[in-house]
């Protein structure tokens, strides 16, 4: 069976796409395919000439922009292993991730030059620091991205590649520190549909030549990944545009702006958008509802989401403004693709948190018994087929998440479900206390540790409270030291100096006693109920 490699796919796409087709759009700047091909080939060759070797890790530390897409493509072509970096991290989090990943190359935006300057000496194994100019004052003793992309003939590298080449997706770990999920190119391509999309009836391609022939006759997509490309959902949305010979549109705003998104859809005739549930969809619906005149979003045919709840009411709101939309709600994670899906159109409504079980999925109890449809039992959903190799440098976590059951290797990321009589899944949530806020994984232990470093805090517990916008809102309940004064905003500001801003609790609630069990264990259920009741009372609900 032929092995797939993203660098080979891009070389093949480069060879057939009309050179004047637009490949990347960011603000007013458009890069056409002939220039995308030339620049990514130049960049790939320059990184290898600079000392990188196949298998080395290349980390990307920037917001969504065209250079991010170019850098990903160049890394694929040079056989370098992609590493995503959360641009919200503070310095010790960055050092941990880049050191854990064994990053040899870091491509970063100039806005982050001060952070890079602060950590460089602690990362002696990074051989190339490549800076993308973005209007901010850059750093010293760095390599200019643009000089690498523009220097050279732009010819293909002409190197052999392998389906075993890797892509790392760093995701939250059980202690709050990120872990690198290792995907082989061949497995990731097959796991994402092998150039097709079975959820809307597009079959996979059997090999590269058949895939290329299909691209010659299919209309090219215009994709708009709205989540950060530093996460899997946004990243795969951008990669899909490039590997399909289409156009990837990215927005300039530092945070999600629904009006900018709608303007981009209208202006660039976007055909597919990627979101993360209600955190993106609700602002889009609200912007559409208030707009006068209404933006023209008739070109948009598919909106895909993964990672957080996407409610039926919000889906209906989108369909009210464009009845031709297909809304694909994917049940997946960095460790497990294709756990389930839910497709909604104007003719087919679906319930919230209900998914069709993927064809390679089963549901198991904690003692590894298979849960049968309609049994009323709950279990953890598992998927076989194309899977990650495991977690980088973490054999114990790999063995736990990717067990072999009855001779079959599965990925079981920890999502609890109930299998209904009709075979559909009702999503119950993570068995752990992981908080999912707008697609970001936040583990309570890390936030609790930051809170407990505050002089006024004797103890702290952190939970996720249901939130219409964020999916879950991070809420802390703190037990104060005797005679300590409570200042919620000051405490938030303190925590923000120790962990990334998105992990800082939206609310901090004081209590006299957290009532831990004698063995020190926390009653998270009680804390969550207390937080929900308190917040309801404060809102007057």
Model segments located where?
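Conserved AMP-binding/adenylate-forming core of the ANL superfamily
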Residues: 2, 22-65, 69-73, 90-95
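Structural core segment of the AMP-binding/adenylate-forming
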Residues: 49-50, 80-150
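AMP-binding/adenylate-forming catalytic core of the ANL superfamily
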Residues: 89, 95-96, 106-108, 332, ...
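AMP-binding/adenylate-forming catalytic domain of the ANL superfamily
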Residues: 132, 497-521
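Conserved pre-ATP/AMP-binding loop-to-beta segment of ANL
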Residues: 152-170, 176-177, 182, 213-222
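Gly/Ser/Thr-rich phosphate-binding loop
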Residues: 173, 243-244, 270-275, 285-351, ...
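Conserved AMP-binding/adenylation subdomain of ANL enzymes
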Residues: 190-226, 230-272, 287
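Conserved beta-loop-beta connector loops within the AMP-binding
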Residues: 362-384, 419-422, 484-488, 522-523
């Amino acid at each position: 069976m032929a092995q797939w490699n993203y660098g080979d796919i891009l070389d093949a796409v480069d060879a057939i796409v009309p050179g004047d087709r637009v490949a990347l759009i960011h603000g007013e700047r458009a890069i056409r395919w002939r220039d995308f091909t030339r620049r990514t080939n130049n960049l790939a060759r320059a990184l290898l000439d600079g000392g990188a070797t196949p298998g080395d890790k290349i980390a990307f530390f920037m917001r969504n922009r065209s250079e991010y897409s170019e850098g990903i493509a160049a890394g694929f072509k040079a056989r370098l292993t992609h590493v995503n970096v959360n641009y919200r991290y503070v310095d010790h989090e960055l050092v941990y991730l880049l050191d854990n990943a064994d990053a040899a190359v870091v491509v970063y935006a100039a806005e982050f030059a001060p952070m890079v300057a602060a950590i460089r000496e602690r990362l002696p194994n990074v051989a190339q620091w490549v800076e993308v100019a973005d209007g901010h004052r850059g750093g010293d003793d760095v390599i200019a991205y643009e000089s690498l992309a523009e220097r050279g003939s732009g010819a293909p590298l002409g190197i052999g590649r392998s389906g075993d080449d890797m892509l790392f997706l760093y995701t939250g770990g059980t202690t709050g520190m990120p872990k690198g999920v290792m995907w082989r190119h061949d497995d990731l391509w097959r796991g994402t549909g092998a150039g097709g999309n079975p959820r809307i009836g597009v079959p996979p391609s059997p090999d590269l030549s058949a895939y290329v022939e299909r691209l010659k006759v299919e209309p090219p997509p215009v994709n708009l990944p709205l989540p950060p490309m530093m996460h899997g959902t946004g990243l795969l949305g951008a990669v899909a545009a490039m590997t399909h010979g289409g156009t990837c549109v990215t927005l300039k705003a530092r945070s999600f702006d629904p009006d900018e998104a709608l303007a981009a859809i209208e202006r660039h005739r976007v055909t597919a958008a990627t979101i993360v549930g209600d955190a993106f969809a609700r602002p889009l619906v609200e912007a559409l509802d208030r707009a006068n005149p209404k933006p023209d979003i008739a070109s948009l045919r598919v909106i895909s989401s993964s990672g957080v709840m996407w409610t039926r009411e919000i889906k209906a709101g989108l369909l009210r403004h464009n009845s031709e939309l297909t809304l694909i709600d994917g049940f997946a994670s960095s460790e497990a693709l294709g756990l389930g899906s839910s497709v909604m159109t104007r003719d087919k409504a679906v319930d919230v948190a209900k998914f069709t079980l993927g064809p390679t999925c089963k549901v198991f109890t904690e003692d590894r018994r298979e849960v049968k449809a309609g049994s009323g039992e709950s279990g953890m959903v598992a998927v076989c087929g194309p899977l990650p190799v495991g977690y980088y440098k973490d054999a114990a976590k790999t063995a736990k998440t990717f067990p072999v059951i009855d001779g079959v290797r599965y990925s079981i990321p920890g999502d609890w479900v109930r299998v209904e009589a009709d075979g559909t899944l009702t999503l119950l949530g993570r068995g752990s206390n992981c908080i999912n806020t707008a697609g970001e994984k936040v583990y309570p232990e890390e936030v609790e540790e930051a809170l407990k470093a505050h002089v006024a805090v004797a103890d702290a517990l952190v939970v996720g409270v249901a939130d219409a916008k964020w999916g879950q809102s991070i809420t802390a309940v703190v037990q104060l030291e005797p005679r300590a004064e409570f200042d919620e905003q000051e405490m938030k500001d303190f925590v923000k100096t120790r962990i990334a801003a998105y992990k800082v609790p939206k609310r901090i609630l004081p209590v006299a006693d957290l009532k831990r069990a004698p063995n020190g264990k926390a009653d998270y259920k009680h804390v969550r109920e207390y937080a929900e009741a308190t917040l309801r009372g404060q809102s007057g609900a």
